[in-house]
């Protein structure tokens, strides 16, 4: 299995439960594991009945398992502050207040949330994953996740254009220098070029890691809405040149015993039959294989039940 494992899917299908169960399974197999939530709902804390922050902390009762929850709002503020500090060092004092004003306005603009969250989880992959054999990501609902995963290519192209424009600008300043006059800007040691180059390397790492060192699984429920959403998600991954390793069917209805014939038993049999039809559709029409089928429990999946679910996750 790849070092980085992502679980995605439609909201409410049980991504967090599956992510935490898989992380528990890995830890129980002596695979040092970190589970990371990028979902604003912060349900990882609820599953383990333990509060987590943006630094890895040991999960009580599970040796070899740490957890952390990335807060998108905190990450956005941190992201904007880093930009503010970086630009303040490279522009005149007269422009600093205008930069601050523009950054405050950008707080609620489309893409700001995704950019900050993207930086956060790639930083985890790049800088905080060394102590671990495996890092499991419990992601936000499919649409947000696909936008995140598409950022390396989009922002990489954008950075390339900025680098080109900056080099053009410096080249003009160098050519405009007269006689022995020192040009106002030099290519070597230019702080803007250096910052852009670091961002380019960051995006290149992210794209390479997600294509070559990450496995993506989609969690679905056995209903038509979830199946349709999963189909669109698979198409979205394919468009981004990312392969979905497998599908996990969650919240399946347990079949009643053969000798049960009451109204409830008849209802359950009909529901089970409908769900089997949906799973048959998934097997026939989708390229990624169905790698696990997890039945619903009568109680919330927490504590001991998490290990019970983990036993069904042979992925």
Regions found by a protein language model. Name each.
Residues 1-3, 26-29, 315:
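Terminal disorder- and signal-encoded targeting elements
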Residues 21-95:
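N-terminal phosphate/diphosphate-binding loop that engages ATP/GTP or pyrophosphate donors
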Residues 17-18:
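Hydrophobic positions on the alpha1 helix immediately C-terminal to the Walker A/P-loop
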Residues 9:
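The Walker A (P-loop) glycine that initiates the GxxxxGKT/S ATP-binding motif of P-loop NTPases
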Residues 200-217, 221-315:
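C-terminal lobe/tail of nucleotide-utilizing enzymes
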Residues 91-218:
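Phosphate/Mg2+-binding loops and adjacent switch elements
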Residues 14:
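Conserved glycine(s) of the Walker
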């Amino acid at each position: 299995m790849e070092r980085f494992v992502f679980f995605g899917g439609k909201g409410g299908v049980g991504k967090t439960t599956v992510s935490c169960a898989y992380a528990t399974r890995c830890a129980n197999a002596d695979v040092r594991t970190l589970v990371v939530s990028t979902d604003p709902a912060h349900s990882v804390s609820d599953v383990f009945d333990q509060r987590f922050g943006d630094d890895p902390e040991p999960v009580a009762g599970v040796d070899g398992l740490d957890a952390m929850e990335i807060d998108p709002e905190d990450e956005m503020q941190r992201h904007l502050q880093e930009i503010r500090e970086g630009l303040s060092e490279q522009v005149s004092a007269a422009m600093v207040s205008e930069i601050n004003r523009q950054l405050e306005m950008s707080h609620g603009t489309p893409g700001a949330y995704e950019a900050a969250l993207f930086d956060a989880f790639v930083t985890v992959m790049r800088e905080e994953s060394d102590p671990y054999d495996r890092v499991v990501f419990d992601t936000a609902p499919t649409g947000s996740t696909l936008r995140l995963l598409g950022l390396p290519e989009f922002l990489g192209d954008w950075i390339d254009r900025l680098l080109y424009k900056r080099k053009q600008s410096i080249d003009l300043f160098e050519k405009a220098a007269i006689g022995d006059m020192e040009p106002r800007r030099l290519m070597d040691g230019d702080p803007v070029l250096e910052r852009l180059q670091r961002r380019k390397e960051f995006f290149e790492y992210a794209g390479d890691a997600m294509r070559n060192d990450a496995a993506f699984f989609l969690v679905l429920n056995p209903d038509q809405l979830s199946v349709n959403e999963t189909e669109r998600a698979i198409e979205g991954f394919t468009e981004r040149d990312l392969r979905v390793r497998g599908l996990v069917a969650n919240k399946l209805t347990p079949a009643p015993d053969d000798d049960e014939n009451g109204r409830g038993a008849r209802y359950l049999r009909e529901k089970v039959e409908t769900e089997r039809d949906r799973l048959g559709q998934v097997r026939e029409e989708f390229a990624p294989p169905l790698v696990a089928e997890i039945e619903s429990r009568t109680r919330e999946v927490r504590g001991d039940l998490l290990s019970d679910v983990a036993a069904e996750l042979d992925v």
